[in-house]
Amino acid sequence: MESSEVMIMRIIQTAGKRKSAVARATIKEGNGRVRVNYKPVEILEPEIARFTIMEPLVIAGEEILGKVDVDVKVEGGGFMGQAEAARIAIARALVEWTGDMNLKEKFMKYDRTMLVGDSRRTEPHKPNRSTKGPRAKRQKSYR
């Protein structure tokens, strides 16, 4: 291949966070393959996490999904935190890839946290009864 025929491949990388889970999505031209931690999304377990990850793909539609490959690497947190972090990363990547404000509007109308993220975090435990949680009190007895 001559130097004048160099093919430029478009690659977009985005990130999503949920609780302590961090997902990094890479999207490039392809034929619709979606992988999470090197596994096809179709075989992910549990099922509820798979459906959560698939939401932005279903909303975007086959015409967009058929043209791209999505690879997501997720670490930290529990399985639902990871699934929601992956969902955020995929949604952001698809919006950036298409540059379509209608798609962004669809995502925002369906669920705002798909693009914006959810800032809620667990409350730190307080010193009094630290193992019981942040607001645990001794049971009060009137007799």
Swiss-Prot record:
Keyword Ribosomal protein: yes
One GO cellular component term noted in the UniProt record for this chain: cytosolic small ribosomal subunit
Keyword Ribonucleoprotein: yes
Gene3D superfamilies per the UniProt record, alphabetical: 3.30.230.10
Organism domain of life: Archaea
Compositionally biased residues, Basic residues: 127-143
GO molecular function: RNA binding; structural constituent of ribosome
PROSITE patterns cross-referenced by the UniProt entry: RIBOSOMAL_S9
Keyword vocabulary terms for this entry: Ribonucleoprotein, Ribosomal protein
A biological process from GO: maturation of SSU-rRNA from tricistronic rRNA transcript (SSU-rRNA, 5.8S rRNA, LSU-rRNA)
Chain intervals for the UniProt region annotation (Disordered): 118-143
Annotated family: Belongs to the universal ribosomal protein uS9 family.
Entries under HAMAP family matching the protein: Ribosomal_uS9_A
NCBIfam families linked: PRK00474.1 (NF001749), uS9_arch (TIGR03627)
Protein's recorded name: Small ribosomal subunit protein uS9
Organism: Thermococcus sibiricus (strain DSM 12597 / MM 739)
Lineage: Archaea, Methanobacteriati, Methanobacteriota, Thermococci, Thermococcales
